[in-house]
Amino acid sequence: MDKIIKTISESGAFRAFVLDSTETVRTAQEKHQTQASSTVALGRTLIASQILAANEKGNTKLTVKVLGSSSLGAIITVADTKGNVKGYVQNPGVDIKKTATGEVLVGPFVGNGQFLVITDYGAGNPYNSITPLISGEIGEDLAFYLTESQQTPSAVGLNVLLDEEDKVKVAGGFLVQVLPGAKKEEIARFEKRIQEMPAISTLLESDDHIEALLKAIYGDEAYKRLSEEEIRFQCDCSHERFMNALASLPSSDLQEMKEEDHGVEITCQFCQTTYNFDEKDLEELIRDKS
């Protein structure tokens, strides 16, 4: 079971989220059949979305779009406050060579572009916020977004590690944020600790990477666990939802599908589930429009 643990320092100067997103990213890889580089890029974006959604309340939904300049295309993820996230990459079969040490490169793979966050509070008029991709590594781009767009100094680390067969081995990350009222010496102490932290890849390799992350963030400093919540890859598509989408098409288009194709097959981009609509379904839609 994947989870996110929310914590706050005893002094109230900082808060930290730590995540185990292994099954989330593994499910995404299985559904989209992504190559190594696209698995890591999509996985990091899914984790980034889980972090952002954990910061919201109510029925808020967050869409993250990593709009890079490479042949990978856009990475699009959607997360809600109930722990659900879904996502896809436009060209999952695109891949680049690993480094000599076997490292999967993401920054050069994603390229230059924009980090777009769409926040939908469920009341209409979603709020869009855009910052440039500063590295394409996703974690650094999320930290820059939080610092620039939300005016909250943040440190982010996230990664996806693959095994010898390029299958997801472990995935997770962390967010650390300065809270209002933090003293200069507290900020300096935490900044030093973050700078001296082992690489996120090293921490994820630990037997219990959640505890390893918390230890690296807080050291010997006291902190409180505020909550532990389940997170997962979960798509909200359905036959009914796609039926409603078809209903928005002109009757002439529906008639053409009925007569020439004898139905239509639709595949959800987010989870690759396929839905079939036969002539009877299309006839019903046409009749409802008349």
Curated annotation (Swiss-Prot):
One of its GO terms (cellular component) is cytoplasm. Disulfide bonds join 235-237, 268-271. It is found in: Cytoplasm. One of its GO terms (biological process) is protein refolding. One of its GO terms (molecular function) is unfolded protein binding. Pfam families: HSP33 (PF01430). Keywords: Chaperone, Cytoplasm, Disulfide bond, Redox-active center, Zinc. This is 33 kDa chaperonin. It comes from Streptococcus pneumoniae (strain JJA). The gene is hslO.
